[in-house]
Amino acid sequence: MGARDFERHLLSGADGSARHEADVLVIGGGPAGAWAAVSAAAQGARVLLADKGFCGTSGATAPSGTGLWHVSPEGKAREEAKASRLAMGGHLAEHAWMDRVLEQTWVNVERLKDWGYPFPADDQGALRCTSLQGPEYMRLMRKRVKESGARILDHSPALELLVDEHGIVCGATGVNRQTGESWVARTGAVVIATGGCAFLSRALGCNVLTGDGQLMAAEVGAALSGMEFSNAYGLGPAFSSVTKSLFYNWATFYTADGVAIEGAGSSKGRGVIAQTLQSQPVFACLDRADAQIRAWMRTAQPNFFVSFDRQGIDPFTQHFPVTLRLEGTVRGTGGLHLVDDSCVTSVPGLYAAGDAATRELICGGFTGGGSHNAAWALSSGFWAGAGAAAFGRDARARSSQRTVLRAGGVALSSRGASTFDSQEVVRAVQAEVFPYERNWFREGDALRDSLSRLDALWERLRTSAPAATATEAVRAREAAAMLATSRWMYRSALQRTETRGMHRRREHGKLDPSQRHRLLSGGLDEVWVQRHAVKEEVAA
């Protein structure tokens, strides 16, 4: 299963206009990547962070507010918090991991307080720590990364991982999008914190979230988990990229002629919206919010209202068109499989955090975004950074004896005669994963039909020529990553012949108790899927 699909080439001394050495390379500069960098540096590691955009402003968290799974250790609060989500996620979460995340989130929030994050206070003066304002949060995290001594490479997407002769990950190569220059980072360990894959659906902050890290990890043999839990659709205005759905709990949904749609809702009833959208437009109005709630909404998530104000629409009194945008594994739970508490993947030297990693461990097959994902990002980032630091310092001590190989495949080391059109590939993938009738409501024959086209498209890509320029390489790798992601998720969805969490099968509409297991997947030319047991709670 770890067999590579492309020939690996020796890294030469001429590779890379800029060359870096460090103990730990963190790929991705969102909350998970920032926490990983800070944590690794605190362990005494030399840290390099490479971000596809500008660390602190790119990604799903930076432009918006998010809830946070911040629960007091007092009384039964945490037990109740865990129990409230177990059934929703299909009973695939594990108590030990939920306990760890709840505690690490509590500890890291105390750090945020010490660092000066401005949590608001309630009427009694107690700080409310159950939400974070993305812009303020990520400005602070960028500042902390720099103060930790880590070096940041902005606008510098990674293209491929480096491995030694034993298959241990030891760095990456990439490009600077502004200068076009290539870079090489030789490190003792790598943390993948590149986020999930939203398939360029134009959801807010998701334009950089194309599954690049998962592709690079799969090229070195890493396994993924829970990729069937990848059909999360964000609810939002048809004219806006904002998919923050909390406020729609106060909405009524209507047809074009003003008739309320029975059963339609945000938390429960989103399937009714998806079903209706297949045949006609759907409109919403936040007409169930009273004056006090309306005032709170304006202060809680001000960016929610920007597009309405520009359009001259009052969302509390006027009907506006809504849509469901695919957010894939960003708001889903699938991602890289983790094999122990340090957040190491199935490949030595490679760690994963945030939405790049599976969140089944705390959410099972459903998250809803926000709260749990935010807690997972700051916790898994903290652990992955510490784990990578411990591994990386030891590995760097032996680095001079290593043979270093480039692991990238499609658009980098493929040997065809002509390049492929990245935009054409993106459109082809979107045509298979966007439609509600294929992805929201899944069915075996439709999944097989999509996979036949997606597999054929992969065969075309793997026999193409390498990208000619740095810009083309970035776009080509994004397209390849989205294609690979779609194949892992549909292969996994085909094997899970039940409805569990966010995964829905038309012909298997009920939960099957015999399928209470996770599904690991991987591979590129040949995608594989296998069962993986959920760890049971051990009685004290």
Locate each region found by the language model:
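Extreme N-terminal leader/targeting segments of oxidoreductases
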Residues: 1-24, 42
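Core beta-strand elements of the Rossmann-like FAD/NAD(P) dinucleotide-binding domain
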Residues: 19-22, 179-189, 346-347
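Glycine-rich active-site loop/strand segments that organize a redox cofactor
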Residues: 69-101
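Glycine-rich loop(s) and the adjacent beta-strand/alpha-helix scaffold that form part
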Residues: 189-241, 364-387
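Long, amphipathic alpha-helical stalk/connector segments used for oligomerization, subunit docking
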Residues: 391-472
